[in-house]
Amino acid sequence: MPSIAASQRATPPSAAALGGLYPPFRFSYVEENLTRGAYPKPRNFRFLRRLGLQTILSLTPKPPNDALQAFCAEHGIRSIHLPVVKAKETIPFTYSKCAQIVSVLIDAAHLPMYVHCLDGLVVTGVVMMCLRKLQHWSPTTAFSEYMRAGPDAPDVGAPEFAEKFPGEIVIPPCIPAWLW
């Protein structure tokens, strides 16, 4: 059997040559068709496109930048912006605002969805803890998930906020099977 010289062997193209698939910082799956992470950058768009997203939910002080808006428009992705200030020393929103956000998350008409804040940590993390409370997770388990997203998360009172979250939200007409 003839041997092929090392220089003649076919080498697979590099990830960069293929365009690369780069998930957003702190990307993770929350539930089927629900993902979360940090503010997506253009290098993340190819990865996000492969998720078949219906919606990108931005929990940020300002509306999505031009690049993210153009990406959504080009791929038929609904962009929802719910203004939330950057977290500093406390949770940057009210229980009412959190209930509004969770109501969007559990509306099956918006799924598959990617939800993000600026850093994918405090704002998104607290919202996910409140979603987990709605799903009857124990506070300890919900906080453990929060810490996995960023063990260096600042102490802004996330566990206390989620524990006191009343869970009084508007249930949309069509909810995902994973909710309850």
Language-model segments: what does each one mean?
Residues 1-114, 119, 126-180:
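Cys-dependent protein tyrosine phosphatase-like superfamily
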